[in-house]
C-alpha cells in the first residue's frame, strides 16, 4: 500500500510542478491583442474580398480600430455600417463612393467554355464556386459576394460578372417619413 501511496504522491508532485510552469508561461508569454479590433472583425462579413482596399476583413478591422472609416465594406452594406457605428459610438456614414454602393454583381460561368481547371474555385474566398477537376464549374448565386476575384485567374475567360436584377426579395423602397418630419415643400408635393 505504501508503494501505491508513494507513486500517487510522486505524480501529484509532478502535476503541481508542471501546472506551476504552465501558469508562469501563460503569464510571461501572454500575447496582447486589441479587443476592439476583434469585436469589429466579428461584425464584418468575412468574405475576404478586398473590396474595401485591404487584403481581408481582419486588416480592415485593425484599420478601423486605428481610426479608418467604417464605410468601405460593400458586402456588409448599410447593416454592417450601422453595427460598426453602434459599436464605436460614431455617426453612421453612407457607403464610400470609391468602394461603396455599386450594383450587386454575381459571377456567371459560361459552362460550355469551362475547362475545369479549378483556378476559380481556389480564388473564391467564400467557396461560392463548385465543381471538380476537368468538370464544369458553377456558381452558387446565394453565396457569391461579387468580389470579382475569380475572373482574373480563369485561363479561358469564361467568367462574367453580371448585375443581379431586382426581385421581390431584393427590392428596396424609401421608408415614408412621419408627417412631423416633412418639410413644407414635401407637404406641397404630397398634397
From Swiss-Prot:
Known cofactor(s): [4Fe-4S] cluster
Main localization, broad class: membrane
EC number: 7.-.-.-
Pfam family for this entry, one: Fer4_21
Top-rank EC class of the record's enzyme: translocase
Note on how the cofactor is bound: Binds 3 [4Fe-4S] clusters.
Record InterPro entries: 4Fe-4S_dom, 4Fe4S_Fe-S-bd, 4Fe4S_Fe_S_CS, Elect_transpt_cplx_RnfB/RsxB, RnfB/RsxB_Proteobac, RnfB_subfamily
Annotated [4Fe-4S] cluster 2 binding sites: 114, 117, 120, 154
Keywords carried by this UniProt record: 4Fe-4S, Cell inner membrane, Cell membrane, Electron transport, Iron, Iron-sulfur, Membrane, Metal-binding, Repeat, Translocase, Transport
Membrane-crossing segments per the record: none
UniProt GO cellular component terms: plasma membrane
Domain 4Fe-4S ferredoxin-type: 105-134, 135-164
Similarity comment: family membership: Belongs to the 4Fe4S bacterial-type ferredoxin family. RnfB subfamily.
NCBIfam families: PRK05113.1, rnfB
Assembly: The complex is composed of six subunits: RnfA, RnfB, RnfC, RnfD, RnfE and RnfG.
PANTHER family tied to this protein: ION-TRANSLOCATING OXIDOREDUCTASE COMPLEX SUBUNIT B (PTHR42859:SF3), OXIDOREDUCTASE (PTHR42859)
Protein name per the record: Ion-translocating oxidoreductase complex subunit B
Gene giving rise to this polypeptide: rnfB
Amino acid at each position: 500500500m505504501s508503494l501505491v501511496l508513494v507513486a500517487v504522491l510522486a505524480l501529484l508532485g509532478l502535476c503541481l510542478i508542471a501546472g506551476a510552469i504552465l501558469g508562469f508561461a501563460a503569464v510571461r508569454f501572454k500575447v496582447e491583442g486589441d479587443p476592439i479590433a476583434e469585436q469589429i472583425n466579428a461584425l464584418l462579413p468575412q468574405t475576404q474580398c478586398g473590396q474595401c482596399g485591404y487584403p481581408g476583413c481582419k486588416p480592415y478591422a485593425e484599420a478601423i480600430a486605428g481610426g479608418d472609416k467604417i464605410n468601405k465594406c460593400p458586402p456588409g452594406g448599410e447593416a454592417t455600417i450601422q453595427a460598426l457605428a453602434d459599436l464605436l459610438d460614431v455617426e453612421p456614414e453612407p457607403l464610400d463612393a470609391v468602394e461603396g454602393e455599386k450594383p450587386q454583381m454575381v459571377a456567371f460561368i459560361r459552362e460550355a467554355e469551362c475547362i475545369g481547371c479549378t483556378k476559380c474555385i481556389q480564388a473564391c474566398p467564400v467557396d461560392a464556386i463548385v465543381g471538380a477537376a476537368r468538370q464544369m464549374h458553377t456558381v452558387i448565386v446565394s453565396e457569391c459576394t461579387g468580389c470579382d476575384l475569380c475572373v482574373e485567374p480563369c485561363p479561358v475567360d469564361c467568367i462574367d460578372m453580371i448585375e443581379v436584377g431586382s426581385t421581390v426579395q431584393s427590392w428596396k423602397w424609401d421608408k415614408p417619413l412621419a408627417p412631423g418630419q416633412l418639410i413644407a415643400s414635401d407637404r406641397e408635393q404630397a398634397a
